[in-house]
Every structure is written in C-alpha cells, then in structure tokens.
Amino acid sequence: MIEPHGGKLVNKIATEEEKNEWLNKSKELKSISVTYFDLSELENIATGLFSPLEGFMTKEDYDSVLNSMRLSNGTVWSIPIILSVKKEIADELKVGEDVLIKNQEDSKEYAILHLQEKFERRKEEEALKVYKTQDKAHPGVKFLYEQGEIALGGEITLLNRIEHENFQEFRFDPKDTRKIFSEKGWKTIVAFQTRNPIHRAHEYLQKTALEIVDGLFLNPLVGKTKDEDIPSDVRMKSYEVILDKYYPKERVFLGVFPVNMRYAGPKEAIFHAICRKNYGCTHFIVGRDHAGVGDYYGTYEAQEIFDQFKPEEIGIVPLKFEHAFYCTKCESMATAKTCPHGKEDHVFLSGTKVREMLSKGEKPPKEFTRAEVAEILMEYYMNK
C-alpha cells in the first residue's frame, strides 16, 4: 500500500476519554464559532485526509506554501489550509491557549485549537499566488476576501464528527479506504474526481485508466461548490446508476470526497492528488482544466504543474488525458491521440454544455451521456 503523504497517516480524533476531559473543562476555555467550511477542514485534518497537516497552518508554512508550494520542511503542499477570524476575535485569544471551536449554527463543541500563532492573512498576495488572479468574480477569490483577516495557527484535537445528513454509506476516512482497497487485493488504484454528473468523456477516461490498474475509486466532491453546479444528491444518483449498469462491480468503488471546492485550477490539482494518495490511491486522473473555472487557467495547466516536482515528491502518478470527444466517423469516444478525423466530426462534451441543454429542457443525446443519467438530470431540471 502506498505511504500517506509525509509518511504517516495523521489521526487527530480524540479518544472517548480525551473528549470527556476536554468537554469537562470546556467552560474554562475561550471559544470561537466557525462556519461549516471550517468544520469540514477541521475534520479532514483530523481524519488524515490532509496528512501531513496536524492543524491549521502557522505563518512559516503559510509563507512557504505561497512561495514554493511546499511546507516549511520541504514536503510538497500547494494550498493554504487556514483558519481565519476577524481581528477583534483574534485579539481576545492568547498564543499558547487551548481554544474551543464551536459550530456557529448550533454552538455545538467540535474541536480544540492548540493556538500556536496569530498572523495576518495576506489576501491579495494569496489570491494571486493560489488563484493566479485577484478578480472577485472568481469564486475562490471572492470567498477568500470574505474571510477574517487574522489567521490562527496550531494543531487541533477533534472532539465531535460532523453529523452529515446525506451519503452516510459513502463516507470513508483514509484508514477505511486503505483497509477496503487492501481487502479487495488492489495494489494499484486510480482515483477520479468530479463535481459533475458522469458524461461519456468521463466514462472513457475512467475505463481507459481501468485497463492499466486494479481498481477505480470514483470520488465525487460533495463539499462546498458553486451555486450553479448540479447538487451532490442528484450527481450521486447518477453515479450509482451508471456504475450499476456499465462498470464491472468488482473493480470500482464509490466514496464521496468531503472537501470544499476552491476552483484553484493547477494548485488544486496537486492538492487533490495528495488527498487521493492519503486515501491509498496510486494514480490520479487529471483531465482538461481540472478544478478550473471560467478562463482563469490554461486547458492543460493542471497537468503541466506536476512537471515542477520529482515524481517521488508527490508520490501519486498523474494520468494526464487530453480532451475526449465522440467522433461520428469512428463512432466511438476518442482523443486527438487516437482519432485522425477533423473537428467537424467531433462532438465535444462538457459538464457546462450538458447543464446548458438541461436548463433549456433539452435531453442530452447518447453521445453526451447515458440515457439513464439523462433521465435523472432531466427530472431534476424539470422540478427546479
């Protein structure tokens, strides 16, 4: 089994005894209330999905990630994982204190932050270095500018898990997926990330990858996404039906990716690959404009960024695929590498194009998506 990033799978979940100890003295602790976004980041640190991180970044790691895509110890890491609050809240907290973290929705106690450092979040610089733009029309940049200006760095202890309302049967921590892959006898596993329903281009990439590995981990993102993205429950329904009818059941595994979407393109592709390595995957499919939005990134920039590192530094193999299309002359899916015909014979597929058709009440053709998936999507759009 592939090693977790940094060599060790982090576990910051309190034992029952530790949890009771912290809760018994919770009234003596200062507390801060945070959003669901922050709670999910906390949980992903605690379960080891963000290994080797053991908490929210300190200034040294923050600076290093912005400037070199590495933690201060040299480990590759491309996205800042930050807990930030308004200055007046930060002023009440002292470095060295244990701070109780609550959910701002219901005041439930979720974690302890062992406050190591307070520092200013340089939002303009962060926007440029992570997202390559300071344009507030970019959803990741907009979200960044809405956050507090002071970052709180330090290790965490998770007291309670988030009580998710959906997909319980598809939620797996890295320790779970590693055990499952091992029990299945899979030595090589390819992960596929998506925030769209599976169309024929996705299916083509997944099945091409499945020819060279033991198993496919279909890992759709169910964290925070853009409002116009198709809801995760509709997408999950489409994944279940397509896996049931068109994939070999013993060679695929479906589990959700509980991470918030940042739309950081190339840098997010590295981050997504590292998370899948922590799940136990050996390969990761990187298609065109991975984690992109609008025209902020080049078509294959998310693939090219992997070339900036030695393969062993990231440790998971990126499978770089060109834009797949349906060729009317070949009568099959293909890419420019496998099809000799001109663009006039190519039907290009994208989640955006499918969404456009559905919003107009048009059923996507079979070259776009399987009929069963089209029906699920049509039903959703008709009931919107």
Swiss-Prot record:
Keywords: ATP-binding, Nucleotide-binding, Nucleotidyltransferase, Transferase
SUPFAM superfamilies hit by this protein: Nucleotidylyl transferase, PUA domain-like
UniProt EC number: 2.7.7.4
Glycosyltransferase listed as a keyword: no
Keyword ATP-binding tagged: yes
Gene Ontology MF annotations: ATP binding; sulfate adenylyltransferase (ATP) activity
Gene Ontology biological process terms from the UniProt entry: hydrogen sulfide biosynthetic process; sulfate assimilation
Pfam family, one: ATP-sulfurylase
Entry-linked InterPro entries: ATP-Sase_PUA-like_dom (IPR025980), PUA-like_sf (IPR015947), Rossmann-like_a/b/a_fold (IPR014729), SO4_adenylyltransferase_pro (IPR020792), Sulfurylase_cat_dom (IPR024951), Sulphate_adenylyltransferase (IPR002650)
Pathway noted in the entry: Sulfur metabolism; hydrogen sulfide biosynthesis; sulfite from sulfate: step 1/3
Recorded catalytic activity of this chain's protein: sulfate + ATP + H(+) = adenosine 5'-phosphosulfate + diphosphate
NCBIfam families: PRK04149.1 (NF003166), sopT (TIGR00339)
Family label: Belongs to the sulfate adenylyltransferase family.
Annotated protein name in UniProt: Sulfate adenylyltransferase
